[in-house]
Amino acid sequence: MYPEGNERMQKNAEFLASYIKDLTGKSLSVQAGTEGKGILLQLGGSSEKPEGYQLKVTDANVVISGPTEAGVFYGIQTLRKSIPVVQGMDIALPAVEISDYPRFSYRGAHLDVSRHFFPVDSVKRFIDMLALHNINRFHWHISDDQGWRIEIKSRPELTEIGSKRTETVIGHNTGKYDGQPYGGFYTQEEAKEIVAYAADRHITVIPEIDMPGHMQAALTAYPELGCTGGPYEVWKIWGISDDVLCAGNDETLKFIDDVLGEIIEIFPSEYIHVGGDECPKVRWKTCPKCQARIKALGIKGDKKHSAEAYLQSFIITHAEKFLNDKGRQIIGWDEILEGGLAPNSTVMSWRGESGGIEAAKQHHDVIMSPNTYLYFDYYQSKDVENEPEAIGGYLPIERVYSYEPMPKSLTPEEQKYIKGVQANLWTEYIPTFSQVECM
């Protein structure tokens, strides 16, 4: 039962009833109400945390309460984990009272669909896994060198050309290829469907358009946006391409605005991820347009950063201003620290914690996502011969659970900028969704 007139609580109730039906075969009625036997979902309770909840099981009923619909949903997840898989049998739950709340407001998980593409149903299943674990942010990596995966109507070549590669390297850049054309992308309507599906599970989808590096697929579609003018091809190997967006070309800025302008119409999230990682500067160093931009902006290199590193900050700041004007915020990988942070940016620290610590000291919000603890494309055991292929590394589940995201080197005031954590799944070596589930 759920509070009458509350659509989100009704969806919570329908979600739980559907789960119980699938798991046990038992059909529960879903109706508005505040009293009675059965499972009662209620707003209120004693939790002062917006995502907190109370779960109380007695011989009369089960009551899940919280100050928000999201809090109640997390209580539902705890109940889900208590229900045994018993098709056709009565369900017995022990009498219990649980009060709980999440430590961090941002609890994220990332899926790369550029290196390998996964259809809508698989993405929804990934979201279902996040919901079970009280994850409230889904970081969706939808563009990279190996494929552009989201429809941009003003730039149709991004998917007509940029979503397809001729073949894919076998293994770790062995020089051998599978000879099979590969592609796929999401229409805007499909992306909106996924956004709505996630929202019903109290998960916000954060899209990532990686820039100015990791743009080989986009350059294949629009070669005039690169420093050399191409020709380019959608990458069929893994790694980092030297070919990036030309920072001296005004058409690059228009391209960024066009893409982000459509992205914010699809994704209502506060954050838009702009990447900013692994952007080689070799093309910019010899590009007349980029060097002219450096001169026009009066950029000078120094002992800390090259002029080209400061030029990347110009691109990220341009994207931030565009998004801020539309009421959105940018988030980027910790490389956006190089050359100076854009004024309102949030840093996602993946190369260890140092980037996050530096950003917090500069009073910027931080999401901790260190590869040494939270990269799920690493091997889970040392028996690599009997594990699915991975990028390398070794990350057993014990190490994941041992992670403490609040650096002791920060003052209490600086620690306030650590907003949460995120696990990342890159898919160079993960071609199937069954392997996604395994990792």
Give short role names for the model-derived ranges.
Residues 112-145:
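A conserved hydrophobic secondary-structure block that centers on an alpha-helix together
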Residues 329-345, 350-439:
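Flexible, acidic glycine-rich loops studded with aromatic residues
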Residues 253-257, 261, 265-276, 280-348, ...:
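Gly/Pro-rich turn-and-neighbor structural signature
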Residues 146-200, 215-254, 283-307, 313:
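Aromatic- and acidic-residue-enriched carbohydrate-binding clefts of CAZyme catalytic domains
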Residues 20, 68, 109, 130, ...:
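Conserved, mostly hydrophobic/aromatic
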Residues 1-106:
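Contiguous, structured surface segment used for ligand recognition
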Residues 104-107, 134-136, 199-203, 268-272, ...:
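Short, well-ordered coil/turn segments that N-cap beta-strands
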Residues 108-122, 244-251:
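Active-site mouth loops of central-metabolism enzymes
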